[in-house]
UniProtKB/Swiss-Prot annotation:
Key words of the record: Cytoplasm, Methyltransferase, Nucleus, Transferase
Compartment(s) where it occurs, according to its Swiss-Prot or TrEMBL record: Cytoplasm; Nucleus
Keyword Acetylation set for record: no
PANTHER family registered for this protein in UniProt: METHYLTRANSF_11 DOMAIN-CONTAINING PROTEIN, METHYLTRANSFERASE TYPE 11 DOMAIN-CONTAINING PROTEIN
Protein name: Uncharacterized methyltransferase C25B8.09
Species name: Schizosaccharomyces pombe (strain 972 / ATCC 24843)
Amino acid sequence: MIGRTFKTDIADYETARPDYPPQITEWLNDEFSVNETSTILELGAGSGKLTPRIIASQPKEIIAVDTYVEMLDVLKKKFPNVDCRVGSAMAIPLEDESVDLVACGQCFHWFANEEALKEIYRVLKPNGKLALIWNIRDNSVPWVEKCSQLLEKCRGGPLNMFEKAAELFPGYGFTELKQSLFTSAKKYSIEDLHRLMNSFSSINRLPVEEKEKMHAELDEIIKTIPRAQNTDQVDFNILTVAYSSEKVPIN
């Protein structure tokens, strides 16, 4: 994760954060014409949650960039053929006009600013593309909405991920964002739900007493979740919001 400081429990992040649905690979191929000649920069790659979907799109090369060295180490162990580099969105360690696509999974809100967009513009080839992807909770489910409200309370307010992105486009040499939406589901155990909350940077930073209070409140929410008898497995619906934009000449 790049920009403002992102810190999390890597084990919780790996275990509890949802993977991206297979439709993302199809979207990469269809929306961006990814093929065997494409070079893709995965910016803010973290531990490589998005990486398998990029690999499945069969590009020529994938370069993963992140400031969080420990996360990149996890990615490299999982995907040894990916070129991992330490760097930030404001100082991408790549040559000018060297990549066909910059893909950002679950991270653009950390560096949604003019400086980062100028740097992304620099490394993209002419008519290169930008992909912004987020997995979000389906707040139409009452207990999930309560979890989201608990998270916002701990954060001190909503994250406003999409609003930050929308304010920048069109502009800075990029076209208006085009949105696509995908749905999927993941089964979580009760322990997984606690680990999911721990994976958020704002929760990870809380003092021990406040974190314990948060988990106690989460336990009360969990009691309201409908589920089959003699199981601690719950269905967690996931919405994946994906945006595309194209680099255009700046007058």
